[in-house]
Amino acid sequence: MQALDVLLNRVSVPRLIEPAPTQAQREVLFGAAMRAPDHGHLQPWRFLTVEGAAREQMGELLAEAAKLQDAEVTEAAIDKARNGPLRAPLVVVVIARVQDHVKYPKSEQLLAAGCAAHGILLAAYAQGIGAVWRTGDLAYSPHVAKGLGLAEGEEVIAFLYLGTPLKEPRVAEKVDLAQFVCAWPGKA
């Protein structure tokens, strides 16, 4: 698959089934992530892979976080949190490892980690792997951070769900670029 085809046609694939990406495919996914633009070459990211029974444990962690976040949370919302990680055979947790740095601010490091996540999504599409970015507010819970073993200065920025597409992915819609791009006229 050509690079421009991947860049112009990647879409989210929300319905995923087994099998999960193979080890060889994962090496490509994470290799692509490592090519993310990174001012200062800090590599301010790391990844956790969650699969098999660990997905159920992650679901319990998210359900606990939902209860802690809102004392009046509904059972439906708790169940949704609990079942979230079961929606794909592989969940990749993308973690930003932000460092105090005089030259490279936190915002740039978070953007670099986001680019690493995007690299995984692009590499997934290029290999025919279904993928979708499904993070949600529970990802930012201190309870989830602790349960996932995050260190100080680390934060979850993405839950990427990966697997085999249940059906043929939709075709990317054309975008009116004029709605997003314009020339700056400079000062008058």
Locations of the language-model features?
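N-terminal amphipathic, basic helical "cap/leader" segment at the start of enzyme domains
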Residues: 1-87, 186-188
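C-terminal helix-cap and adjacent tail motif
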Residues: 3-12, 156-188
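Small-aliphatic-rich amphipathic alpha-helix that forms the alpha element of a beta-alpha
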Residues: 33, 92, 98-147
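Acidic-glycine-rich active-site phosphate/pyrophosphate-binding loop
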Residues: 67, 86-99
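Short, electropositive alpha-helical surface patch
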Residues: 144-157
